[in-house]
Amino acid sequence: ERFFDGIEKFKPVLISWNGNGFDLPVIHYRALRHGVAAPLYWESGENDREFKFNNYLNRYHARHLDLMDILAGYQARAFSSLEEVALMLGLPGKMGMSGARVWEYFREGQISDIRAYCETDVLNTYLVYLHFEKMRGLLNEAAFSTEKHRLVEFLKAADQGHLQEFLSQWLDGTGSA
């Protein structure tokens, strides 16, 4: 519900890595199962013309940028993992965790480890997104540096070990902040 409430309130652009292939379908099925209403998310122009050619559901629209899909030119054979792209950019990547282990961690009650994994995935995705925006010419070098600096300051202020480890590995890598 909170996910869809945020969409209703802010109309954000969603940024993901394989969001079309995993995250959003999981959210869709859970919303269906629990009867969660999300009219703006599902809007495709019937009630709001603004969404006819730019909505959250169409693969080629800009309200949801699935970076894996876009960077691969919408060709499944060209997909790369977030880990591969993050490491290529000098980012920490998965830091030893894998999505394949989430179910095991869940069964063992290691919810905080799953949360840490998801949060570092978000950080990697955000930093890949900044590189993407720079590549598209939507961020110049100064804006790119400013955004990275903001993230460094946020991570420095965080008192969670996995965020400190992410920052340390990022600053030690070739994708220096």
PLM features: residue spans?
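Metal-dependent phosphoesterase core characteristic of DEDDh/y 3'-5' exonuclease domains
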Residues: 11-116, 120-142, 154-160
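Generic alpha-helical secondary structure signal
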Residues: 7, 33, 130-133, 148, ...
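Short, basic/hydrophobic alpha-helical segments
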Residues: 1-10
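C-terminal accessory extensions appended to soluble enzyme cores
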Residues: 143-177
